[in-house]
Amino acid sequence: MTVRTIEAKTLLAGHKTPDSWFGIKYTLNLYRGCQHHCIYCDSRSECYGIADFDGEVLVKANAVELLDRELRSKRVKGYVSTGAMNDPYMPVERRLGLTRRVLGVLAARRFPVHVMTKSDLVLRDLDMLGEIEAACGGVTPGAVVSITITCADDALARQLEPAAPPPSARFAAIATLAARGICAGVLLMPVLPFIEDDPENIRQIVTRAYAAGARHVIPSWGVSLRDRQREHFYAELDRRFPGVRARYEQRFGNAYSAQSPNAPALESLFTELAARFGLARTVAPYRAPGPEQLALL
């Protein structure tokens, strides 16, 4: 996979109100394209304008300087998200350390972060996450890490997310993050109909997340199906899961999204498990520490 650098004109995208699922106020993407090659990834869609999502990674070489400059004008603190259209801890990050340097800027500027990833490489940056938590935590966490886990079985995950670390490593990463006082949880999405949408898979993910110390599990009972994303996904289904594509075409046609036929049962099971384990299903928007808490920092 080719890796080359580009100069970005802007980095941060702001939202008038924080996202209701993830609590995010600002988003940024340090890379374009991704090395994990998940067969279902929505970022292949034409609307994102990434010409060669699976063949080339573009690195925003000036991201650190841009972020530092753009944060100076942001008067409202809120979670800055990494990982919306790619994984901030894809393999190239091990060598480049761009995500790590961005975390350093967030710590220095006292901005909270919500990291979304499939990789246990996030553990490399425990020290930076700890700095952000110390600088920003209080009413709500200063540093949140959500790790995507859509199936509990390592062998199945290799078919769906060929270059990402296995679920077992991701559960272990959650345990390490939680032990170090970082708010960690699971993104249980997408759940692929006819492949991952059985109750036992959901039960295992939620139970293992709780055992690892997760504070939240955010579910979605289906997958989007847009233009190039659908084409790639269906080709991979033909190669890896013969016969499943026909079930998608019969059930969903050209629909934008494919919700699992089992969604009501999965939702009922999830609600029961989340209540039993005390797991949130969203991340609340960031609330800055009050004056009395700031005095203790």
List each model region and its residues.
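Short, hydrophobic/aromatic alpha-helical segments in well-folded domains
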Residues: 101-102, 125, 173, 187-191, ...
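Auxiliary Fe-S-binding modules of radical SAM enzymes
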Residues: 1-13, 176, 194-297
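A structural motif
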Residues: 110-111, 182, 214
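Conserved strand-turn element in the central/C-terminal portion of the radical SAM core barrel
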Residues: 152-156, 161-163, 176-198, 221-224
